[in-house]
Amino acid sequence: MKKIIVLALALTLALLFSCGKQDTESPYKDYLLFVGTDQGANTIMKLNVHTGSISPLCQDPLCRHTADSGCHFFGAVTGTIYQYGGKLYFQRRYQSAAGVVSYVIGYDPEDQSEKSLYEITGGGGMGFSLGYFWRSYEDENGDKISLRVDLAAEKLETLDENYQRPIGQYGKQYFYPIYNLGGQYGEYLTHGFALGDSDGNISKKYAEDKIIQLVCTDSIEDDIVLFYCPKQRDDGKYDLEDQTLWACDLKTGEEWLVNDNIGDVYFLRDGDIIYFANWIDDPPVVGFDLNDNKERYNRTGGKIWRQNIRTGETELFLETGHCLEATSIDMIDDRLLFAYTDTDYDDYTEIENKHVGIWYDYKETRGWVIINPADGSFIDVVNTADIYSRR
């Protein structure tokens, strides 16, 4: 449930940050950028999607990637890397003499310069999308504050409390959710979606008869957008782990069912074909979650499927043998990247006949399966710079 809630939050906050095709103006066209460790410090790493090699984005082989080293990429926060307009943006957090500080950083690879665009104090929801850094939070008086940083203009803007934030872009128009449900997940689920101008003036509404959890505005091709609809249980509540996938032609308004059992996994789209790692029946137990008091499962089974969104035809594409992270997929330079996390089950302990993983002690290996969809060939890359694995 935690994973799907994160996806739902992405709907209300911005695009789904970790999935989708790379910025067409990116100077790093052959690389997946991620936060990893080098010289014992967190920094931005690059994975060559053709060779599988991993190296620091910093070009100094002796750099320690610390605040006093002059490194442009020190203190990068996992999951915050964003490419826009040929530049690189990320959040930086590190310990200073005054305490923990956090900034929005813009890096220009052309002249190898960086600039701090915004200092983050406190928490709240935040992230990059549509050429902006967005943030919503409550101040010390309990008032709700919404703001955005225009990355190109390097300008901070405070938003009106009634401002309707777009969730994606389609040509010169913007996508907006339609919130009117209330109740269970009322702030996450929408009653259809709409297109309008940058000021929120709506010009056309879609799928108003459907309850929608996620509109995939980062995967529009040939005027077709895909969206997720959670199934309704017998008790009337919506099941965010049991969803259907629909398509909508933005020109004609025509809708059709693509997949009636997509679960809660994301996909990568290449024309009329989508790739995903779907749930399986009778999934193997990964371990026992002491916090939720229930078993945890590997529901992906290491299998990648592909489906034609128009005909519905589905076929098994590849068996990887890994525990695939079905919500962490990228497409870079015509390569599909499925992330995985494999656990060493020998490090689990039996407690009352339950497999219990010792947090920060049992061994995990993370990596990627990088696929060439043209011929089905792939390479398997272990993340040697992973900041989480215990190997």
Regions found by a protein language model. Name each.
Residues 1-4:
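Positively charged n-region of N-terminal signal peptides that target proteins for export
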Residues 15-18:
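C-terminal motif of bacterial Sec signal peptides marking the signal peptidase cleavage site
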Residues 20-56:
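An edge-strand/N-cap motif at the start of beta-rich repeat modules
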Residues 278-283, 292:
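Loop/turn-rich, solvent-exposed surfaces of beta-rich toroidal or solenoidal domains
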